[in-house]
């Protein structure tokens, strides 16, 4: 029988360290399991149970990791980017139908005022002075409408308590869509546990491993690969406050890790400081380095492996797959740099435009859309029949990535079939930015698109046509977007044009626009 998260987290020895953090004592697996049970009991006492949505807005670190694990074990956790602006929080909290919001005690997040406005129950996460890394208690606020805060749900969400069952929803994330409205991706216990188990097996985690987590813990990458998968093997996870190239090697010296996972932009920043920190690398040799979320330049792979004397393992994941789909194997098995490796859990295939599965090979006729199916794949987007009709074909989930599978089964991504901008692993819906810019009084027409960037892979750009007689600067429009959207969504370059280039049918075409404008 497939395990639940509770089963996976039962692996580590009671006295072994599960969670650690800079300059703090560690939290044992026994204490972690007690914390999870206590947290669920606390939530249940507030009328919050299985499948109820609990939004989490916390800074990166050990409490974010343990709060996620506790919530995902018995309710539907909904981690949100703490850098969101009020408008974004209002959209996400309302769209999720959140029953509660967990924030740090003393936080001034704009999410708090939004939660009060929406009648979402506020719960403070309290960390005692000198507490081990990740240990906390929950304390409900006496917010106005406390009675209403045991929010009546829409009838779909129950209030059954205790640990979740396999088909209960454990995490709810949004993924950027080609339309302006982000799509809700519900992930079940089955999905998360399957993905964590796949990653654990692929990377050969054991109780002797320690992972240095620098990934944000409101993304699927950090939560599943950085935290849940290693803990499922009884490994230790060293939780940092978030990526900081200047502190990385000091953290490495303290944590004594055996591995870390990151996106290519982080790896590039790390490798630029590796030579100066050769002594740290020598003291704490890594078993491997892992990269996912966007493609890694081959030159950076060579540099990293030369400095760390360890293999860099490229993986391929996405939210709808609870992260990992493919991964290059560990030595001595064959690694193929530049590919995203072999199927690593789910079934992976290449589908032609007619819906047929294509044979292996790297020739043009073998190029198609990468599709997946398996226990880690979401059952479908919530309340979005159109997206589900488009996203699934013959039982396979369509990734939107174009690729090939060579004779050995290794997958190479050759392009994108969708308009989503991948900015260093942060996914941006161009339509969302379009709509913000269109609210500016001076803007008549706009189209946002991705333009190449040497480190991030892609950066956000926009073409703008102004209303007759109006004027505005690039900096003013960037500031306008920044007031309503997270910084990574703000266009780096804005081109003012008399007319936006269109395709043969007269439609605005984002894909390929950067090249047409000489930006790529």
Language model segments and positions:
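Conserved AMP-binding A3 loop
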Residues: 26-30, 163, 170-194
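Conserved ATP/PPi-binding loop(s) of AMP-dependent carboxylate-activating enzymes
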Residues: 342-345, 356-390, 428
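Gly/Ser/Thr-rich phosphate-binding loop
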Residues: 257-262, 271-335, 347-349, 354, ...
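AMP-binding/adenylate-forming catalytic core of the ANL superfamily
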Residues: 84, 260, 374, 379-380, ...
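Conserved beta-loop-beta connector loops within the AMP-binding
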Residues: 349-371, 407-408, 470-474, 509
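Conserved AMP-binding/adenylate-forming
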Residues: 41-87, 96, 105
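Conserved AMP-binding/adenylation subdomain of ANL enzymes
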Residues: 193-210, 220-258, 269-276
């Amino acid at each position: 029988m497939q395990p639940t998260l509770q089963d996976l987290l039962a692996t580590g020895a009671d006295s072994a360290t599960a969670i650690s953090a800079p300059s703090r004592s560690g939290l044992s697996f026994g204490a972690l399991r007690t914390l999870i049970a206590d947290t669920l009991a606390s939530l249940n006492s507030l009328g919050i149970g299985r499948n109820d949505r609990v939004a989490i807005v916390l800074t990166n670190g050990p409490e974010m990791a343990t709060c996620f694990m506790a919530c995902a074990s018995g309710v539907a956790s909904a981690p949100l980017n703490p850098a969101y602006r009020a408008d974004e929080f209002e959209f996400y909290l309302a769209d999720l139908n959140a029953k509660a919001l967990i924030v740090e005690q003393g936080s001034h997040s704009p999410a708090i005022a939004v939660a009060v406005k929406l009648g979402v129950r506020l719960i403070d996460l309290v960390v005692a002075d000198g507490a081990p890394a990740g240990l906390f208690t929950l304390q409900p606020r006496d917010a106005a409408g406390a009675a209403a805060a045991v929010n009546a749900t829409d009838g779909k969400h129950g209030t059954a308590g205790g640990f979740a069952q396999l088909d209960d929803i454990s995490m709810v994330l949004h993924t950027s869509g080609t339309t302006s409205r982000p799509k809700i991706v519900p992930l079940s216990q089955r999905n998360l546990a399957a993905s964590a188990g796949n990653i654990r097996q692929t990377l050969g985690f054991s109780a002797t491993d320690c992972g240095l987590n620098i990934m944000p813990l409101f993304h699927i990458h950090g939560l599943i690969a950085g935290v849940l998968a290693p803990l499922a093997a009884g490994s230790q996870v060293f939780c940092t406050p978030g990526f900081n190239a200047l502190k990385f090697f000091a953290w490495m010296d303290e944590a004594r890790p055996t591995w870390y996972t990151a996106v290519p932009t982080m790896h590039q920043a790390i490798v630029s400081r590796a030579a100066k920190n050769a002594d740290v690398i020598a003291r704490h040799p890594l078993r491997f380095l892992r990269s996912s979320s966007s493609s890694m330049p081959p030159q950076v792979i060579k540099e990293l492996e030369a400095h760390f004397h360890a293999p860099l393992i490229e993986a391929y994941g996405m939210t709808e797959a609870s992260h990992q789909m493919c991964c290059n194997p560990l030595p001595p098995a064959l690694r193929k740099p530049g590919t995203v490796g072999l199927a690593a859990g789910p079934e992976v295939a290449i589908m032609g435009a007619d819906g047929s599965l294509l044979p292996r090979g790297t020739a043009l006729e073998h190029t198609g859309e990468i599709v997946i199916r398996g226990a880690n794949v979401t059952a479908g987007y919530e309340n979005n029949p159109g997206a589900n009709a488009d996203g699934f074909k013959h039982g396979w989930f369509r990734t939107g990535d174009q690729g090939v599978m060579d004779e050995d089964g290794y997958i190479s991504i050759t392009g994108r079939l969708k308009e989503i901008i991948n900015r260093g692993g942060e996914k941006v819906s161009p339509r969302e930015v379009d709509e913000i810019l269109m609210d500016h009084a001076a803007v008549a027409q706009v189209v946002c698109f991705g333009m190449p960037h040497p480190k991030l892979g892609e950066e956000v750009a926009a073409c703008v046509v102004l209303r007759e007689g109006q004027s505005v600067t690039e900096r003013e429009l960037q500031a306008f977007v920044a007031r309503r959207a997270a910084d990574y969504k703000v266009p780096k370059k804005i081109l003012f044009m008399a007319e936006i280039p269109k395709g043969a049918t007269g439609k605005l075409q984002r894909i390929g626009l950067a090249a047409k404008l000489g930006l790529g």
